Amino acid sequence: MHSTAPGTNSNGRTSTRIFARHAFAALLLTTVAVALAQPPKPPETPAQQTKRYFDGVNKQVLEMAQDFPADKYDFRLRREMRSFGEVIVHVMSGNVYAAKAGRGEKANWDEVDPKNYRTKTDIVAALQKSIADCAATLKAHPIADGKSIEPWIGVMQHSSEHYGLLVAYYRANGLVPPASRPKSK
């Protein structure tokens, strides 16, 4: 008579199956643990934060510029205020200022003349160009640690204020701004 260990049959198959299952489970858990234990992302640098916020506000303003009806680009909330199109050109002028100042060039805030941009197509194209120029400047002349984030922070604040003003142009025309519309699922 052959003696067998408890939990096995005469050829040891039951113990082998149990061992294989435990080994597989351990391997699976180890794989999951390694995948989940990736090091956390390092905190954003001031340059990365600046670019993210700058891109964010410009994306919102560009979306409004593209969305607002062309026949309403001359609309003014009050006679003495800028038209919708002129506000977009003013925001674009801030971008031109930021890009030049970011490269160390002499820059004036309102050096862009709104009279040179009469149509929605012209205004949107100029805004897109100014955004691309800012992106190129931020890439070529990154904000180093300890370096001031001016002019970028001032232009971001300014553009954000005008974004809020542009919402009023939408509402005064019975329109819903893009960011306030229900998101499709």
Predicted regions mapped to residue ranges:
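Short, contiguous alpha-helical
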Residues: 51-55, 59-62, 72-111, 144-185
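Well-ordered alpha-helical scaffold segments within catalytic/enzyme domains
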Residues: 60, 64-65, 99, 133, ...
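Bacterial N-terminal signal peptides that target proteins for export
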Residues: 4-27
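Membrane-proximal, proline-rich intrinsically disordered regions
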Residues: 68-69
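Acidic/histidine-rich alpha-helical segments that form the ligand environment
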Residues: 115-163
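Acidic/histidine-rich, surface-exposed loop or edge segments in extracytoplasmic proteins
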Residues: 39-46, 104-116
